[in-house]
């Protein structure tokens, strides 16, 4: 066993002494040592209950003959970090999470690992570490939050973000907003819609690195605790059979993940996270692959923010197994892939009798919400290397649109203009110098997009940025424009009043300025250099790659 490097032989007597200092017996030290990576904290609503999940995991490990050893991981709440300097640090935390787990699991050579994340960057960060370490491992997340609301109807966190604009517009009172803030997020769990955290937890299940139900079983249920116990027991079986993450995550698993992502209408952040995750296994996932899969995969679900359903509804309708079963009927999922159950996907679906239980929540592949997937990749003179839009959440009026550029060099300037009533129908808000390097950190633009929706402009105004978006964003929100402005991208050449052509069906995003004029602008163009006081962010800006390749560190 891997842990024998730390526990076995004459020379390791001092090591055993330190383990005894933890209260471990000789018998416990001789058993397989299982690292339990727990991202619990008292800051993030999606992580506040993870100690309960960890205790269940450890009980499962002990029941199956192992010795669990828990250690922590950081986690950022993107909702709390939104619209201030804290958001610069969210995406960089993904790499720090992966690196810190590599440090812990190498310095202390565990035989197996159980990963317990829940929210936005903790899930991809842990998946990256899982594939990097490639020892028997399993993931079990904390589960989704239930939707909130009152007798008047359901709400979630995005309802509150958009309500800010409604109050500014005069459509809602502060008293009504205060009531919504107290009811929209009713308890622990990852925010209730198909936002980034829940999308990535569904992806972990789809990849075969988590047990069925991981993406959708609500956080507050006993079923979630039982799932955690099963995960603890299952990792011991994976160890016995030497089933490692890289034996599960193959090119076929990559294709499955992207297909399910498109069927779900998942967060655009998957276009950053999945390439980074699969890259740890030596697998390439390009923007062209995303678009190729999207063009042939039907969009079966419209969960919040694209629709009124939530993750709890997806779970009741059959969950990820039902979505995969429906895609399998059309030959869009390869069911021969291995999973952490120790069985193939086909065997799992058969055991679960996977099927759609509510065709309103999970549409038939014969009658989807749309014939194409939730995400589209756009290219053109404004984004030669690509840009990303959640087309399943775009109003029909904005699918093809020529708009007038309103140019801002930061999120804060743009948000102030929206809230100040300075944005008009037909405008395309350009927010630049918010990319991975230029931000630095590629902040999410949820506050501006929510303000657009709240101000009643969702069907009339586009937002185009080299930054990124929350999974809760809806509307004509086009992000990840590459190359970014800080790297000399054409988004840096846009001027106030320029015309922008958005053509999502044709996959085009063009700056309607002739080549001669663009060349003249480029001759005098000097990218804006923002002052960066944080040493971490300065290092990040030097190391990070383009959003078009997952905003990973340079290898």
From Swiss-Prot:
Catalytic activity reported: (2R)-2,3-dihydroxy-3-methylbutanoate = 3-methyl-2-oxobutanoate + H2O; (2R,3R)-2,3-dihydroxy-3-methylpentanoate = (S)-3-methyl-2-oxopentanoate + H2O
Q: Which residues bind [2Fe-2S] cluster?
A: 119, 191
GO molecular function terms listed in the Swiss-Prot or TrEMBL record: 2 iron, 2 sulfur cluster binding; dihydroxy-acid dehydratase activity; magnesium ion binding
> What GO biological process terms does the UniProt entry carry, in alphabetical order?
isoleucine biosynthetic process; L-valine biosynthetic process
For this protein, the record's Gene3D superfamilies field holds: IlvD/EDD C-terminal domain-like
Q: Which residues carry this modification: N6-carboxylysine?
A: 121
Asked if the Swiss-Prot or TrEMBL record annotates the protein with the keyword Thylakoid, the reply is no
Q: How is the cofactor bound?
A: Binds 1 [2Fe-2S] cluster per subunit. This cluster acts as a Lewis acid cofactor.
Cofactor or coenzyme needed: [2Fe-2S] cluster; Mg(2+)
Q: Does the keyword Iron-sulfur apply?
A: yes
Pathway it works in: Amino-acid biosynthesis; L-isoleucine biosynthesis; L-isoleucine from 2-oxobutanoate: step 3/4; Amino-acid biosynthesis; L-valine biosynthesis; L-valine from pyruvate: step 3/4
Keywords on this record?
2Fe-2S, Amino-acid biosynthesis, Branched-chain amino acid biosynthesis, Iron, Iron-sulfur, Lyase, Magnesium, Metal-binding
According to its UniProt record, which residues of this chain constitute the active site? 470 (proton acceptor)
Q: What GO CC terms are in its UniProt record?
A: cytosol
Sites binding Mg(2+) sit at 78, 120-121, 444
**What SUPFAM superfamilies would the database entry show?**
IlvD/EDD N-terminal domain-like (SSF143975), LeuD/IlvD-like (SSF52016)
Q: Which Pfam families match?
A: ILV_EDD_C (PF24877), ILVD_EDD_N (PF00920)
* HAMAP family tied to this protein: IlvD (MF_00012)
**Subunit-structure text:** Homodimer.
Functionally, this protein is described as follows: Functions in the biosynthesis of branched-chain amino acids. Catalyzes the dehydration of (2R,3R)-2,3-dihydroxy-3-methylpentanoate (2,3-dihydroxy-3-methylvalerate) into 2-oxo-3-methylpentanoate (2-oxo-3-methylvalerate) and of (2R)-2,3-dihydroxy-3-methylbutanoate (2,3-dihydroxyisovalerate) into 2-oxo-3-methylbutanoate (2-oxoisovalerate), the penultimate precursor to L-isoleucine and L-valine, respectively.
Indicate the family of this protein.
Belongs to the IlvD/Edd family.
Q: What is this protein called?
A: Dihydroxy-acid dehydratase
Specify the taxonomic lineage.
Answer: Bacteria, Pseudomonadati, Thermodesulfobacteriota, Desulfovibrionia, Desulfovibrionales
């Amino acid at each position: 066993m891997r842990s024998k490097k730390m526990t076995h032989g004459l020379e390791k007597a001092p090591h055993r002494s330190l383990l005894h200092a933890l209260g471990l017996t000789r018998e416990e030290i001789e058993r397989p040592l299982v690292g339990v990576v727990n991202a619990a904290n008292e800051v993030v609503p999606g992580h506040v209950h993870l100690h309960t999940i960890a205790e269940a995991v450890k009980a499962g490990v002990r029941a199956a003959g192992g010795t669990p050893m828990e250690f922590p991981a950081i986690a950022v709440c993107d909702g709390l970090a939104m619209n201030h300097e804290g958001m610069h640090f969210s995406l960089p935390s993904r790499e720090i999470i992966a690196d810190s787990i590599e440090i812990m699991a190498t310095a202390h050579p565990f035989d197996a690992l159980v990963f317990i994340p829940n929210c936005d960057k903790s899930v991809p960060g842990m998946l990256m570490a899982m594939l990097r370490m490639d020892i028997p491992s399993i993931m079990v997340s904390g589960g989704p939050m239930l939707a909130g609301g009152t007798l008047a109807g359901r709400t979630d966190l995005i309802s509150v973000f958009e309500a800010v604009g409604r109050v500014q517009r005069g459509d809602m009172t502060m008293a009504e907003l205060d009531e919504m803030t107290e009811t929209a997020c009713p308890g622990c769990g990852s925010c209730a819609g198909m936002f980034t955290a829940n999308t990535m937890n569904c992806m972990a299940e789809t990849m075969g690195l988590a047990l069925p139900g991981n993406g959708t079983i609500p956080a507050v249920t006993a079923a979630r605790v039982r799932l955690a116990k099963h995960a603890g027991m299952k990792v011991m079986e994976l160890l016995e059979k030497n089933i490692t993450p890289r034996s599960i995550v193959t090119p076929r698993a990559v294709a499955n993940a992207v297909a399910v992502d498109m069927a779900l209408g998942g967060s655009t952040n998957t276009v950053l996270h999945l390439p980074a995750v699969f890259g740890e296994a030596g697998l390439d996932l390009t923007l062209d692959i995303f678009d190729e899969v999207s063009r042939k995969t039907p969009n079966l679900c419209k969960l919040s923010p694209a629709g009124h359903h939530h993750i709890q509804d997806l779970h009741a309708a059959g969950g990820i197994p039902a979505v995969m079963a429906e895609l399998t009927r059309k030959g869009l999922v390869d069911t021969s892939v291995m999973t952490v159950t120790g069985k193939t996907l086909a065997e799992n679906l058969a055991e679960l009798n996977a099927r759609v239980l509510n065709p309103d929540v999970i549409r038939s592949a014969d009658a989807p919400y749309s014939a194409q997937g939730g995400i589209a990749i756009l290219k053109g003179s404004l984004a030669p290397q690509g840009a990303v839009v959640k087309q399943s959440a775009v109003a029909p009026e904005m699918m093809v649109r020529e708009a007038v550029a309103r140019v801002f060099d930061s999120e804060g300037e743009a948000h102030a203009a929206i809230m100040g009533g300075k944005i008009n129908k037909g405008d395309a808000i350009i927010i630049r110098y918010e990319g991975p390097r230029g931000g630095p950190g590629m902040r999410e633009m949820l506050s501006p997009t929510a303000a657009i929706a709240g101000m009643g402009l969702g069907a009339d105004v586009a937002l185009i940025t080299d930054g990124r978006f929350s999974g809760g964003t809806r509307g004509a929100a086009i992000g990840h424009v590459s190359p970014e402005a800080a790297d000399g991208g054409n988004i840096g050449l846009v001027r106030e009043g320029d015309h922008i052509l958005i053509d999502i069906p044709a996959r085009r995003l063009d700056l309607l300025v002739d080549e001669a004029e663009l060349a003249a602008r480029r001759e005098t163009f000097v990218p804006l250099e923002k002052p960066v006081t944080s040493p971490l962010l300065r290092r990040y800006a030097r190391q990070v790659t383009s959003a078009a390749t997952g905003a990973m560190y340079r290898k």
